[in-house]
Design a protein with these regions (language model features):
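Cofactor-binding beta-sheet edge motifs in enzyme active sites
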Residues: 2-25, 32-722
């Protein structure tokens, strides 16, 4: 029999989940955490011991996914965790989106059915293993009773229970009805990691075949009988409202069904998308632009810089920072990051059918239950009368943590008696986003004997959590905005972090892939390179001297130095830059090699990343997420910026909010460290590693210490600091 160790449900809930909780947002633990072995589904003809597993009498194994799939590989990894402990036949595993239900499928960290913060595997690692092990134990018990033997004499493997002494076997499908009658055990045995069969193997993704053959259904793919199409124009100025609408020309166009006017937007419903689009273009709209019509990016930065001079709320303070900064070689710098849009390949959309007594929604969202509750308010219905059908997301990146597109679609659909698919154009999507905030991170440090003796860090910027999850905003501190500032990996004896809340004039802000560490990691790692130069030390050796209490971080840094060829001679104007970071309970070190020509153009030559993510459930997914995250972050560093003029976003599509292209992408090598530690998060780690590593490569190649993104090529050509 496989070796196992016993873990009680109480230990999982009070120990495992609480630990995962602290690794995320450090939020107060909710009163009623998820108990994954309940409830059972008593539908005849299948074995459904808990909310996650369904096995019918043919052996078909359906796993219910509490997290959403938006390209990050979660469906495959979560399925592997369940199937590992269930000892399922991987070839028979299918996945389904779980319906909205916080009690059954609420993320154990947040208490909400939400996907984000590189949290899926971390949050569900123990609960889903327990759910799978519980189901396996019930199947084994059913077989043992049928054979008249002890359960301990039976083994489970690949969807079968076997009794070696007699040579008998029964498939899970054959045992489904009998197992359904078993009482779920209170304590279950989960596998010793040494006995893993699926976890740790490079598994092919379960969603790939349907994405290749076109069967995969995204939110935008929903098609219903009698459905019409709509598109919208929102007030171009944030906070503005609809004034007058002349729809006389629009309603005469073939296929145009209705013009719907809301407070801040106008929609045209048509028989098809083209009719809706042409109808919208034919409208004459006068906007009441409101008080924000003259706001510019310059105004926003002036406000932020002024706010950053205030004393902030103290998030962490160790040692005597004033004394430390009064001695040694002093260093001061401020690092600034711009607004960024999400620009998912699938623009925001929702299909809605509102009836007098019910509302049904088809979309792709990262937060199903919030969508359900907000849609209920918009429809004027009880929550239990709202059905949310969630589909694959064509990119989320935090944008689909917001319910605004569904709220608008419900309000539009209330005006008619048929289902309506509402699709925002790329232009409307980019110009009416909830943007990654502008941030200003100030660092004051002192050097004594070649090491940092004092480190004072002040973050100024938007408090996204104050809006999105108010209980997390306490004592004037947004714990997301200072996440990697308080969790810097280095041994700083005198360490002080402050936060100043500064909301940008009129511009809505939200989470963006990488969340709080976006700004923190960039500032910390850029400052460390500048301090290394000030101390006359190699950047990697400088970091190593202050990582002695962080062995996992030290190990990946050593490996990346070796694998990247750190220290080997480079041609003129070619540099290597490094970034190290603890990231969502993972540890990643990255080296970017880049060439900068005489006019400031940048060529990425090579990227090397070493990541210790604990037990890598699917190493292929880890590599893919680091590769994709690096390109996502480097795109922002090279090109990403949303600017405001006269209260309007100036960018509109990929021609002026551009993405990195294939010919610009260098060779990327990702090394996944084998580890027995609990899994860390991986979906966002690469995003935050790329920008500072590139900036430090530029610094090494040119001596130009850039302190603002996106990278200004003119400054590189001129050889100036910015």
């Amino acid at each position: 029999m496989n070796a196992h160790h016993s873990v009680s449900r109480r230990a999982v809930l009070t120990g495992g989940l609480a630990t995962g909780f602290l690794l995320a947002f450090h939020l107060p633990l909710r009163a009623a955490v998820n108990e994954p072995v309940q409830p059972r589904d008593t539908t005849e003809g299948k074995f459904a011991p808990n909310a996650f597993i369904r096995i019918d009498k043919t052996g078909r194994t359906v796993l219910m996914m509490p997290q959403v799939e938006m390209g990050q590989g979660t469906y495959t990894s979560i399925s592997a965790v369940l199937a590992e402990e269930l000892d399922a036949d991987w070839s028979k595993v299918e996945v389904q989106h779980a319906p909205p239900n916080d009690k059954l499928y609420g993320n154990p960290t947040f208490g909400l059915q939400v996907t984000g913060n590189s949290n899926s595997i971390r949050a569900w690692w123990l609960p889903l293993r327990q759910a799978g092990a519980t189901a396996r134990a019930m199947l084994v018990q059913a077989a043992a009773i049928q054979w008249g033997v002890e359960p301990a004499s039976c083994t489970a493997s690949k969807g079968e229970v076997a009794h070696a002494a007699s040579g008998r076997k029964l498939g899970y499908g054959e045992l489904a009805l009998a197992a359904q009658g078993q009482t779920p055990p209170k304590d279950v045995a989960i596998k010793d990691p040494r006995d893993f069969v699926l976890i740790g193997q490079p598994l092919k993704r379960l969603d790939t075949p349907d994405k290749v053959n076109g069967k995969a259904i995204y939110g935008i793919d929903a098609i219903l009988p009698g459905m019409k199409f709509a598109t919208v124009a929102a007030c171009p100025v944030f906070g503005g409202k609809v004034g007058k609408v002349d729809d006389s020309a629009a309603v005469k166009l073939p296929g145009v069904r209705k013009v719907v006017v809301l407070d801040d937007m106008v929609a045209v419903i048509g028989d098809h998308m083209w009719a809706a689009k042409k109808g919208l273009e034919a409208l004459k709209i006068e906007w009441n632009e409101g008080p924000n019509a003259e706001i510019t990016t310059k105004d926003i930065w002036e406000d932020l810089r002024k706010a950053s001079q205030k004393d902030g709320a103290v998030a962490k303070s160790d040692g005597d920072i004033a004394k430390a900064l009064a001695s040694g070689d002093r260093f001061e710098a401020a690092y600034e990051l711009p607004f960024l849009a999400h620009a998912s390949m699938e623009p925001i959309n929702a299909t809605v059918h509102v009836r007098p007594d019910a509302c049904e929604i088809w979309t792709g969202t990262q937060i199903m239950t919030r969508v359900q509750s907000e849609a209920a308010k918009a429809a004027g219905l009880p929550v239990d009368k709202v059905i949310v059908n969630n589909h694959l997301l064509g990119g989320g990146f935090g944008r689909k943590l917001e319910p605004d597109m569904v709220i608008a679609a419900v309000k539009i659909a209330r005006q008619v008696d048929y289902p309506v698919k509402v699709v925002w154009t790329r232009e409307e999507d980019i110009q009416h986003d909830v943007y990654r905030p502008v941030y200003r991170d100030q660092i004051t440090a002192s050097l004594v004997d070649g090491k940092v003796s004092g480190w004072k860090y002040k973050v100024a910027g938007s408090a996204v959590l104050a809006r999105w999850l108010p209980p997390a905003f306490q004592k004037g501190i947004d714990i997301d905005a200072i996440d990697a500032a308080v969790d810097a990996p280095y041994d700083f004896a005198n360490f002080h972090v402050e936060y100043v809340r500064a909301e940008p004039l009129s511009v809505p802000t939200g989470f963006w892939r990488g969340v709080g560490p976006n700004n923190n990691v960039f500032a910390v790692e850029c400052a460390m390179d500048e301090l290394a130069r000030k101390a006359g030390k190699d950047p990697i050796e400088f970091r190593k001297s202050m990582l002695t209490k962080n062995p996992r971080m030290l190990a990946v840094l050593g490996q990346v130095a070796e694998r990247s060829g750190w220290g080997q001679k480079l041609p003129p104007r070619v540099g290597r830059g490094v970034c190290v970071q603890p990231s969502f309970a993972s540890f990643i070190a990255t080296v970017v090699e880049a060439e900068i020509d005489d006019i400031g153009e940048i060529t990425l030559r090579r990227i090397t990343s070493v990541v210790d993510t604990g037990i890598a459930v699917n190493p292929d997914t880890v590599k893919a997420q680091i590769e994709g995250g690096l390109i996502f972050g480097l795109t922002a560093a090279l090109y990403g910026e949303i600017t405001i003029d006269k209260g309007r976003v100036q960018q509109s599509n990929f021609h002026d909010y551009r993405m990195m292209r294939i010919n610009e992408t260098p060779k990327v090598e990702v090394i996944v460290v084998k580890s027995g530690e609990a899994p860390g998060g991986i979906g966002e780690a690469g995003v935050n590693a790329g920008p500072p590593a590139l900036r430090n490569a530029i610094y090494a190649a040119t001596g130009v210490a850039l302190r603002r993104l996106p990278i200004d090529r003119k400054l590189l050509a001129a050889g100036k600091k910015a």
